[in-house]
Amino acid sequence: MKIRNYLLAFVLGSTLAFTKDINFDVVGEVFDYGPQTTKIILKFDEQINPKTLDTQTFKVLTQDLKDRNITTIDFIDHNNVILNLEHGQNIKDANLLYWDDQKFSNVVIPTNYTLIQTKDMTLENRKTIKKDTYKYYMKSLKIKDVDKFTAGEMYGLKYRDFKPQKDGNKHPLIIWLHGAGEGGDSNITQILGNRGGVAFVEEDAQKIFDTPYVLAPQTPTFWMKSFFVGKRELVGEKDYTPDLVNLIKTYIRENPEIDKNRIYIGGCSMGGYQTFKTLVYAPDLFAAAFITCPAYMPSTEELNTVKDTPIWLVHASDDTTVPVSNSRESFKYLKSIGADVVYTEYKDVVIDGNKYDPHGSYFYTLHNSPINDNGINIFQWIASKKRY
């Protein structure tokens, strides 16, 4: 009789009291200032009444049990709910990386969010979901555009790469070389630390570059054998240039849809150093290069070697990490020997009203902001170059 009464109450009643597991996805995005979590996506079996949800219906906790503010709620439909999370340059609890000064590198923060329902909800059929009816479990972390890349390793170098869908045509290859803070063995920080990888898989860049392949290698240590930060010397393992060139050549060979006449290479800071070194080592491989705030002043011999490769340099005059003279002098000499070279100099780095460290002039590059005297933006200029 008790069982019968219970079933009758369940059928006729207005409250769902059983416990059910609901999975949710945490979504992130790479911004100029780094990667952050931006939203949570919930998928319910039942249709939720949108009017019963507000920003206080759920409590979101990070893996460190820090509160994340829910700013707004969106509905994909009545079953799929988006909790938009507060994020921004100064919202540290949203970060997906932290800076390890001892390693002098960015380190991935393991993401394990907790979601707690703090108020009752109502379904479209007017039944009530009590706040302890559902138990919520994080299913996955999805990062916009980063998830378009796959992982690989060759010649002791890990890498992430993006391959466009095959269409029977040849397409360019863009190689992005990260800075000093994105080395290591994670095989992810080189496309998480800044927009250096993801910028080229975004829709606009894909159109400009004719749906390119994108390759982002990661050095196990630093591209440089050694360098100083103040009085502190940081030491890399070796010169990775031969391994890097072997990786690039093998990657091209293994992907015959890549157009060998449209191989573009670029990087920022120490990645700018490595771009110069790679151009010198394999001057006949690349159709163009884009180098931002390079942590290196090439010798005249090296500049003579790369003079036949079109190069666009970008730097900020207020950069206190890498002297602007590296770009100024490189441009001046390359121009004097008749090279196809462009130089864009900014005073500081201000994007959408937000002021950043002036070493971040690569923000401009990755937003396709630099323009030459003919009114051509950097991406369009690079995309116009062919080796033969």
Where are these regions (language model features)?
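A domain-start/cap signature at the N-terminus of enzymes
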Residues: 18-43, 48, 62-171
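Primarily recognizes the serine-hydrolase "nucleophile elbow" in alpha/beta-hydrolase
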Residues: 252-305
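Hydrophobic h-region of N-terminal signal peptides that target proteins for export
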Residues: 9-19
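Alpha/beta-hydrolase
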Residues: 175-177, 292
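Gly/Ser-rich "nucleophile elbow"/oxyanion-hole loop immediately N-terminal to the catalytic nucleophile
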Residues: 165-169, 227-269
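The conserved beta1-alpha1 loop
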Residues: 177-179, 315-316
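Active-site machinery of serine-nucleophile hydrolases
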Residues: 173, 180-242
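C-terminal catalytic histidine-bearing segment of alpha/beta-hydrolase fold enzymes
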Residues: 312-314, 318-321, 325-328, 332-388
